From Swiss-Prot:
Location(s), subcellular: Cytoplasm
KW Transcription regulation (keyword) present: no
Reactions catalysed: NAD(+) + ATP = ADP + NADP(+) + H(+)
InterPro entries for the chain: ATP-NAD_kinase_N (IPR017438), ATP-NAD_kinase_PpnK-typ_C (IPR017437), NAD/diacylglycerol_kinase_sf (IPR016064), NADK (IPR002504)
PANTHER family noted in UniProt: NAD KINASE
Catalytic residues (UniProt): D85
Keywords: ATP-binding, Cytoplasm, Kinase, NAD, NADP, Nucleotide-binding, Transferase
Native source species: Bdellovibrio bacteriovorus (strain ATCC 15356 / DSM 50701 / NCIMB 9529 / HD100)
Gene3D superfamilies linked: Probable inorganic polyphosphate/atp-NAD kinase, domain 1 (3.40.50.10330), Probable inorganic polyphosphate/atp-NAD kinase, domain 2 (2.60.200.30)
Primary role: Involved in the regulation of the intracellular balance of NAD and NADP, and is a key enzyme in the biosynthesis of NADP. Catalyzes specifically the phosphorylation on 2'-hydroxyl of the adenosine moiety of NAD to yield NADP.
Protein name as annotated: NAD kinase
E.C. code: 2.7.1.23
The family this protein is said to belong to: Belongs to the NAD kinase family.
Length: 303
């Protein structure tokens, strides 16, 4: 990933891969079909002169090398994901800020991030190798957790960051600030801070709005608020937001892209802003976001 360029130039760019480059694989671990397809993809790429690596935290695919070192990950020119959106988000985490584009094939249920059909896998990969695909930037979210003024954790997310009560029996009382000004204080099961990419995930299920991927916004959506007036809010993504638990005994879980990262207490302040990194997503040149909404979510379907 690289310094965010979407403010100046949010247009797609052609993806060109040099021969004999390195390509990484991330696959859905518990799906036999994904494991089988990963082997076939590895062989397909090797026949075309590419070095293929299995990315960390998964069993090494036959015929590939394990990406064990920082250099292995740094040298990747493309990552291919075989799975669902959860697998795609795992690939984003594994890249840890690298500007490596991801090409996703859906082997899950919804497949909003893994937008390409697994049935078209080899045709799409061939088009990618021939330079017929494009990469499009998606904004990301950055958060840091302060305790007594000191940073104790930092995270980057493609979809969302969530503060939720988890298994706690009582609602959490959360104060939200924008540029140090109080926005709201609400009792709820939690709050979602979503990027435009994440607006169609947990945010949508919680009643939040869909945001076009190029929208320079965050959406903050309460989860089951104990209030008739608490509603989702859109904020410009050049603003800094902060969240604090009100009450000395309050605790909550902090979740990044679906993975629990840490526990929050009343001593913590969560500060959220736009990440300095963009994520690069591989798409066909004629890809249409609204077609994807209709296909995956039946958006605007009158039937």
């Amino acid at each position: 990933m690289k310094k965010s360029s979407m403010d100046k130039e949010h247009k797609q760019s052609k993806l060109v891969l040099k021969e004999n480059g390195s390509i990484g694989l991330v696959y859905r671990l518990e799906t036999a079909q994904a494991v089988s397809l990963a082997k076939k993809v590895a062989e397909f790429l090797k026949e075309r002169g590419f070095e293929v690596f299995t990315c960390p935290d998964q069993k090494v695919v036959a015929g590939t090398k394990a990406a064990k070192t920082k250099k292995h990950m740094d040298d990747l020119k493309l990552v291919i994901v075989l799975g669902g959106d959860g697998t795609y988000l795992r690939a984003v985490r594994l890249l840890e800020g690298r500007s490596v584009p991801i090409l996703g094939f859906n082997m899950g249920s919804l497949g909003f991030l893994t937008a390409h059909s697994a049935d078209s896998c080899f045709d799409i990969i061939e088009k990618t190798l021939e330079g017929k695909m494009v990469q499009r930037p998606r904004s990301m979210i950055y958060s840091k957790i302060l305790r007594k003024g000191k940073v104790r954790a930092e995270y980057h997310a493609l979809n969302d960051m969530v503060i939720e009560r988890g298994s706690m029996s009582q609602l959490i009382n959360t104060a939200i600030y924008s540029e140090k000004f109080l926005v709201s204080q609400v009792k709820a099961d939690g709050f979602i801070v979503a990027s435009p990419s994440g607006s169609t995930a947990y945010n949508l299920a919680a009643g939040g709005p869909i945001c076009h991927p190029e929208s320079p916004v965050f959406v903050v959506t309460p989860v089951a608020p104990h209030s008739l007036t608490s509603r989702p809010l859109l904020f410009p993504d050049d603003r800094e937001l902060s969240f604090r638990l009100e009450g000395k005994t309050q605790k909550a879980h902090f979740i990044v892209d679906g993975q629990k990262m840490t526990e929050l207490t009343a001593d913590d302040e969560v500060i959220v802003s736009r990440s300095c990194y963009d994520h690069w997503m591989v798409r066909e040149a004629n890809h249409n976001y609204f077609h994807l909404l209709r296909e995956k979510l039946k958006f605007g379907d009158r039937n």
